[in-house]
A protein has these predicted regions:
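Solvent-exposed alpha-helical segments and adjacent loops
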Residues: 1-327
């Protein structure tokens, strides 16, 4: 249930009546890895992070995403707000919506007026999708009749330290390239994209060129999130990664992989962790790897299934002035 707590600075804070109960979490494998995330309004709300809800502008919202290879199993909204001292208790309320579904109501009590209040509202994880909006709606009253919605006495201030506590659990997804570049880059994930590049050993010039093409392509997708490409030599990564390998030069964990007869892009499980995926760029030699990298960057490969063969890459037309794709 939704509850309000007292703060040290404002010991007299009214009790908030219960909201809706949190629903049961989605059914997922209990042994899957999970992570706890705290998203504050300072991070995900429009600047400056705090909100002043008024009679004529009663709504405020925050937005957050969810990766396609994860599911939220628990969610809690932690609110810090101060209601106007002129409000009518109980008749004035703060309604909480997730994706336009009502999650609960926080009535304003007499003890809260003009004082900082802390409240918790459980969020039903079954309503959480790939893109989500939490909306706060202020229902304010300062007299029983003949109210002016533009009155300056109608306000409720929501602090920027308010936030969401989320528990994400990783799903064991199939090796399917039809959703590429997911899971190696997921546009729903607003964190910096860290994607290790794994080589059997120090790459030569042609392999450096191939890996640079792939890194540049992923970097263009990352955009404002930023990106990191740690380099590993003959090591297993601890997260989703890109692996470059040829028939003769490959990391030890791919030593039993069958030899290829053409450039191949394949999605496989991490040998020690099925929740981590590896994108293997395989070829007979470095020239094949360069061709596969160009195929990824130019986007003329039909990605589907666990692996695709890059038989040919059509050359790009010469660039014209002012035709940069990101302009």
């Amino acid at each position: 249930p939704a509850v309000a707590a007292q703060t040290e600075q404002n010991p007299q804070v009214g009790q908030v009546m219960p909201g809706v109960q949190g629903a049961d979490a989605p059914v997922v494998a209990q042994n899957g890895p999970s992570r706890d995330v705290k998203l504050t309004f300072a991070q995900i709300a429009p600047p400056p992070g705090s909100m002043v809800l008024r009679g004529i502008n009663p709504n405020g919202s925050i937005e957050f995403g969810m990766r396609s290879d994860e599911v939220v199993t628990k969610a809690m909204l932690n609110l810090e707000y101060t209601p106007s001292p002129s409000l009518l208790p109980v008749q004035s309320q703060l309604k909480v919506y997730l994706n336009d579904e009502l999650m609960g109501v926080l009535p304003v009590t007499k003890e809260q007026l003009g004082k900082k209040t802390l409240a918790q509202m459980p969020i039903n994880p079954l309503f959480i999708t790939d893109f989500n909006r939490v909306r706060l709606e202020f229902v304010g009253h300062y007299q029983d009749v003949c109210e002016n919605p533009a009155s300056t006495t109608l306000w409720l201030d929501v602090g920027r330290s308010s936030g969401l506590d989320l528990t994400y659990q990783t799903l064991n997804v199939k090796n399917d390239l039809s959703h590429f570049p997911v899971p190696f880059f997921d546009p729903r994930d607003n964190r910096t994209n860290t994607l290790p590049m794994v080589f059997a050993g120090a790459p030569d010039v042609e392999l450096q060129q191939a890996s640079a093409i792939v890194a540049s392509w992923f970097g263009s997708r990352s955009g404002w999130r930023g990106q990191n490409f740690p380099v590993l030599y003959n090591q297993l990564p601890d997260r989703n990664a890109i692996v470059f390998a040829t028939n003769d030069k490959r990391p030890d964990f791919l030593r039993d992989h069958p030899a290829v007869k053409a450039p191949v892009i394949e999605m496989i499980n991490h040998p020690q962790n099925p929740y981590v995926k590896l994108l293997v760029v395989f070829g007979r030699d470095d020239k094949d790897l360069l061709q596969a990298a160009k195929g990824i960057a130019q986007g003329n490969i039909l990605f589907r299934g666990e692996s695709v063969v890059v038989n040919e890459v059509k050359p790009l037309l010469p660039r014209k002035p002012y035709d940069a794709p990101n302009w």
